[in-house]
């Protein structure tokens, strides 16, 4: 029972970290703010965080609403629930990578709250690609299947965050990611294993064709290490922004794969 209670504490803390969903104070009594162990719950927390968007997809699918309108609303709800946390990371990362002449200038740009050209373009592409991918495949699934596919994608994208986080050292001291700690090896394994397993089961329940499932996992397997190598070359480590960007890029890759193969 103690292990289950600790896992649920980690789920609650992960939900608080990854979203704007209110979490009761009792989960934070005596908590030091570290996420080294709590990251194991990221995939489970992702499913809870994505339930509102999945419900919207189900309702609009059952009402036979326009696929483009449904896709826009689903992405909008996701951004509202998370407070656009991951989108902010993608925008800052794009500005830093695109405008930074070297490591130091890239990190300095990423600290600037103002959005630049590279960040704006990255966000337009992220929203556009996710909306177009959802509009392409949601009408081909049942309303229930569409909602479940969103949950599967969410679990994979948050597992990707943990992998990126664990593979690189902090690029700077005092950042959000550095203060949250480094994922414990066991927690990283649990996050990756549970993320992949949950996604596999949920894709099956959603009625996703086998070829689409494997293509989505291939996209996951290419996007996450690929971006991590770029971050290592550009910054020599991770930041909170690159962790958020990992989530966005993984979601785009997986949704794009589903749109191509379903």
UniProtKB/Swiss-Prot annotation:
State if Cell inner membrane is listed as a keyword.
yes
What EC number is given for this enzyme? 2.7.8.26
The pathway is: Cofactor biosynthesis; adenosylcobalamin biosynthesis; adenosylcobalamin from cob(II)yrinate a,c-diamide: step 7/7
Q: Which reaction does it catalyse?
A: alpha-ribazole + adenosylcob(III)inamide-GDP = adenosylcob(III)alamin + GMP + H(+); alpha-ribazole 5'-phosphate + adenosylcob(III)inamide-GDP = adenosylcob(III)alamin 5'-phosphate + GMP + H(+)
What GO molecular function annotation could you give as one example from this UniProt entry?
adenosylcobinamide-GDP ribazoletransferase activity
The prosthetic group or cofactor this protein requires is: Mg(2+)
Q: Where are the transmembrane segments?
A: 41-61, 65-85, 115-132, 134-156, 195-215
- Superkingdom of source: Bacteria
Q: What is this protein called?
A: Adenosylcobinamide-GDP ribazoletransferase
User: In which organism is this protein found?
Assistant: Rhizobium meliloti (strain 1021)
In the UniProt record, what gene is named as encoding this protein?
cobS
């Amino acid at each position: 029972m103690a292990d289950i209670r600790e896992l649920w504490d980690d789920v609650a803390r992960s939900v608080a970290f990854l979203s704007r969903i209110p979490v009761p104070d009792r989960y934070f009594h005596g908590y030091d703010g570290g996420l080294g162990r709590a990251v194991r719950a990221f995939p489970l927390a992702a499913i809870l965080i994505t339930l509102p968007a999945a419900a919207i997809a189900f309702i609009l699918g059952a009402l036979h609403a326009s696929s483009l309108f449904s896709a826009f609303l689903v992405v909008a709800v996701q951004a509202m629930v998370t407070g656009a946390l991951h989108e902010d990371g993608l925008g800052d990362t794009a500005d830093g990578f695109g405008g930074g002449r070297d490591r130091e200038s890239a990190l300095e740009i990423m600290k600037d709250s103002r959005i630049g050209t590279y960040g704006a373009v990255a966000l337009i592409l992220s929203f556009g690609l996710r909306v177009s991918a959802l509009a392409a495949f949601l009408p081909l699934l049942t309303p229930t299947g569409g909602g479940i596919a969103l949950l599967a994608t969410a679990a994979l994208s948050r597992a990707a965050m943990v992998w990126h986080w664990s593979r690189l050292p902090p690029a700077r001291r005092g950042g959000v990611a550095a203060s949250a700690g480094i994922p414990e090896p066991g927690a990283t394994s649990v996050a990756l294993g549970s993320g992949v397993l949950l996604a596999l089961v949920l894709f099956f329940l959603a009625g996703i064709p086998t070829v689409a499932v494997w293509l989505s996992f291939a996209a996951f397997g290419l996007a996450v290490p690929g971006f991590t190598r770029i971050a290592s070359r550009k910054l020599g480590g991770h930041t909170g922004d690159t962790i958020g960007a990992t989530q966005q890029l993984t979601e785009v890759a997986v949704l794009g794969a589903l749109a191509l193969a379903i």
